[in-house]
Amino acid sequence: MKRAILLTWDVEEYDAPADFGARPLPDGGLSRGVAIWRQWLEISARWKIPGTVFVTARLAEAAPDLLRETGQRGHEVASHAWSHEPNVDLQLAKSRGRITELAGAAVVGFRSPRLRLVPLQEVRSAGYRYDASSNPAIVPGRYWRIAQKRKPHLDSGIWEVPASVIPLIRFPLFWASFHLLPLPLYLAACRLLMAWDGLLTLYFHPWELSELREKEIPFWIRRRSKARRIERMNTLISCLGEYGEFRTVRDYLGV
């Protein structure tokens, strides 16, 4: 079986600077989030690969045309809860229903904002078939989850699809590592994991490929220009495509 690459994106209100201490934008980052999403569709068009897009219902309501275009491009549309505000009701069922209505396609996947832990029974009861909120690693200042399983598995009648981590040391290959590591080293780690598991699950945010002027955003993210960050992502996708096949999460699980 050909190795699978699950490239996933969290499409949300632009509140990343606020996460790092900046003053929240007046509209919670809604208008900037729409602009970044539109720009991401332009950037990703050249890749010609399917991915999985977890979008908040609030952003989907603000840009239903972009939501439909995302699905028409061959991407799976999934739920990222109702909004990206911290510590609020995720409205699991309501967000799934609203995104389904706006997208005109069934929504079966869920990822919580900031990978917040949500009981899988609640996710399943809301009508989802899989949850992608697990990053089974140590992320300083965020969480310690090395006891969680590393590969997709059924739990409480629902699929759990963890983000990829290096075995044994549990080093995460999530979005931050992409910016922190030299690209050849990051690619080598991805290839190692594909050889080991036959699967690579990555997640990023469209805002990572946008103009980042806010001084509160850490230097390790904004040290490269927007053009350079896009170029690195283009290179990553091109190189990974030589080792595996890009698929949506739903297609991979067969749900």
Where are these regions (language model features)?
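Catalytic alpha-helical scaffold of carbohydrate-active enzymes acting on polysaccharides/glycoconjugates
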Residues: 1-162, 166-168, 185-255
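Binuclear metal-dependent hydrolase catalytic cores centered on His/Asp/Glu-rich metal-binding motifs
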Residues: 171-184
